[in-house]
């Protein structure tokens, strides 16, 4: 499988997990929304890594983006996207660790308005990553 095909697969996965996170948000399930948004960020990270020929199965793809930033010549637009992915990843990682109540199903301390902002940021970020993917093919 070449880099472009792999990146294409991760774009499709990103679309799917972003839709699942949106559906979970609409159902009021903040924990599952956070989980799926994290997966979306991982998939978007894999899109960027694949486009630049980096495949790493040992670490989180979001963490490997730092290697991409220092090992390849990338423009400021891509660096900005990398920083935004990493920032959102840190926010979501903290949210997923905190459970509201041990007697209920898993939940997070964030409320709908805050999660909506994160969902909107990830959606916007997806559009940017898809734009980079498209730029690679034109």
Tell me what each language-model feature is.
Residues 49-138:
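Long, charged low-complexity segments
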Residues 33-34, 40:
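Solenoid-repeat scaffolds in large eukaryotic assemblies
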């Amino acid at each position: 499988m070449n880099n472009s095909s792999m990146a294409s697969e991760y774009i499709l996965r990103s679309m799917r997990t972003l839709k699942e996170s949106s559906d979970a948000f609409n159902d009021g399930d903040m924990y599952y929304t956070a989980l799926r948004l994290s997966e979306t960020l991982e998939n978007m990270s894999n899109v960027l890594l694949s486009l630049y020929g980096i495949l790493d199965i040992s670490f989180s793809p979001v963490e490997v983006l730092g290697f991409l930033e220092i090992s390849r010549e990338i423009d400021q637009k891509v660096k900005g996207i990398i920083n935004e992915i990493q920032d959102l990843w840190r926010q979501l990682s903290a949210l997923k660790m905190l459970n509201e109540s041990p007697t209920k199903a898993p939940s997070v301390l964030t409320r709908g308005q805050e999660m909506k902002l994160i969902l909107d940021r990830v959606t916007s970020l997806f559009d940017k990553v898809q734009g980079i993917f498209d730029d690679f093919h034109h």
